[in-house]
Amino acid sequence: MHIAALHQPSQVQLNQDGNLKHFLTIEGLSKENLTKILDTAQSFLDDNNNLINRPLLEGRTVMNLFFENSTRTRTTFEAAAKRLSANVLNIDIARSSTSKGETLRDTLWNLEAMAADIFVVRHSSSGAAHFIAKDVCPKVAIINAGDGRHAHPTQAMLDMLTIRRETKKPFEDLSVAIIGDIKHSRVARSDVAALQTLGCKDIRVIAPNTLLPVGFSEYGDHVRLFNNMDEGITGCDVIIALRIQNERIDSPALSSQSEFYRMYGLNKERLSLAKPDCIVMHPGPMNRGVEIDSSIADGEQSVILKQVTNGIAVRMAVLALSMQGQLQEQGLIEAIAL
């Protein structure tokens, strides 16, 4: 079974013309939808991987609503919005009226009344972004910047853009390994869904049983489970290392971090089992010496910093595409090169 089949296609994410209205999850979107995001992001990068500014959202207001701490995701969304000439407001949730007992609905309705065009939302509760898009502020474009263990769609798309740009191979021809804390990782879920939707036929998930989600067998024929890391990464084109999500683990899942590194840490010896041109990725933040050795994180096969740059391009694309209908009305959509 395809992972997308585990969920009802999200009618909330697309408008009546089939264009992106909200970006909440990978599930429910087609290969064409995802390719459109990738192609749009590509248009914001030159041949030297430098970002290209375009004033497509001039006069629009983007509000970053981060109910969970974040550095990389929040700042790249802010950078993306500013490169599109949008006004950006970072709402300090800890000091907002929600800390004084105001409901989430009332907080969001007040922010919507301030003429916000886009909310970028990170929340600890799975499904929070979908709830806001469907039941609270349907007129504001909602971009999910991570909700609990559920989804991190822009991270998945920046990972897909990095894979496409760096391997220069069709997804159908790639072997991709995802290693680490799969159970608690929204990145893993979104990456698997995106890889499947884009046609990857060899997705390898490598983890101890304690860090695998329940019902893993339902993820599909093209997803294989490995408890043995050496076996799992042999012949891979892409390796995505994930950190252990200690903040989401209710009970001990590992005997120790040193034991995890011994069994699942990516080092030079293990990387040599993959293809010679294998690329190494990590969504960050990294725990060096736990899931990845510094020599690999900083090595020639690492594209981790390129992921950060690609993340800005992808978030520019998602922000612009969420306003696509209005941009078309203004005759600006041609500048996105769709």
Swiss-Prot record:
UniProt cross-references to Pfam families, sorted A to Z: OTCace (PF00185), OTCace_N (PF02729)
Reactions the enzyme catalyzes: carbamoyl phosphate + L-aspartate = N-carbamoyl-L-aspartate + phosphate + H(+)
GO biological process: 'de novo' pyrimidine nucleobase biosynthetic process; 'de novo' UMP biosynthetic process; amino acid metabolic process
EC annotation from Swiss-Prot or TrEMBL: 2.1.3.2
PROSITE patterns from the UniProt entry: CARBAMOYLTRANSFERASE
Domain of life: Bacteria
Residues engaged in binding carbamoyl phosphate: 72-73, 122, 152, 155, 284-285
Keywords linked to the UniProt accession: Pyrimidine biosynthesis, Transferase
Pathway: Pyrimidine metabolism; UMP biosynthesis via de novo pathway; (S)-dihydroorotate from bicarbonate: step 2/3
Keyword Cell membrane appears in the UniProt entry: no
Top enzyme class: transferase
Gene Ontology annotations for the cellular component aspect, listed alphabetically: cytosol
An MF annotation (GO) of this entry: aspartate carbamoyltransferase activity
Subunit and partners: Heterododecamer (2C3:3R2) of six catalytic PyrB chains organized as two trimers (C3), and six regulatory PyrI chains organized as three dimers (R2).
Entry similarity comment: Belongs to the aspartate/ornithine carbamoyltransferase superfamily. ATCase family.
Function: Catalyzes the condensation of carbamoyl phosphate and aspartate to form carbamoyl aspartate and inorganic phosphate, the committed step in the de novo pyrimidine nucleotide biosynthesis pathway.
Protein name: Aspartate carbamoyltransferase catalytic subunit
Organism name: Acinetobacter baumannii (strain ATCC 17978 / DSM 105126 / CIP 53.77 / LMG 1025 / NCDC KC755 / 5377)
Gene behind the chain: pyrB
